[in-house]
Amino acid sequence: LFGTKWAPTAADPSYGILYIILTSIIGTAVSILIGVPIALLTAVFLTEVSNKKLSAVVQPAVELLAAIPSVIYGLLGLMILNPVLYKLEKHVFANSATHQFTGGSNLLAAIIVLAIMILPTVINMSVSSIQAVPQQMRAASLALGATKIQTIFKVTVPAAKSGIMTG
């Protein structure tokens, strides 16, 4: 089962799924490394930087994105992202004699789709956690001479870290 050879139709079938498992782990980890910082910075922007009007427009849009089924994200990735990545792949590997073209369906496409899929959930959890930080902590930081950016990244985000990590 944890072998590296996948030959289910051979005379002596082999069902090694080690590469499939490793690819899933790598794809998930990289999509988290891409998606979480983007989502956290978006949540900081929505709660600490933007005006109320913009937040009132963007927040429902983020919640709407959270309601989209994962199958739809996958379909959009297949229909939109794969052709773009295939063109990029043809351009990058134009002179390669050994490259097997994937048609755009590759780990990069999966990572991008997964990173987009986790954005709404992480944004919503981060917004809730940042809003739960007491206003007195922000006021104390500003009273001690910290700038707004320093207050956000040295006081507010660390105070909200446990709630953000839960999401």
Residue ranges and their predicted role:
Residues 65-111:
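Generic hydrophobic transmembrane alpha-helix motif, especially the helices
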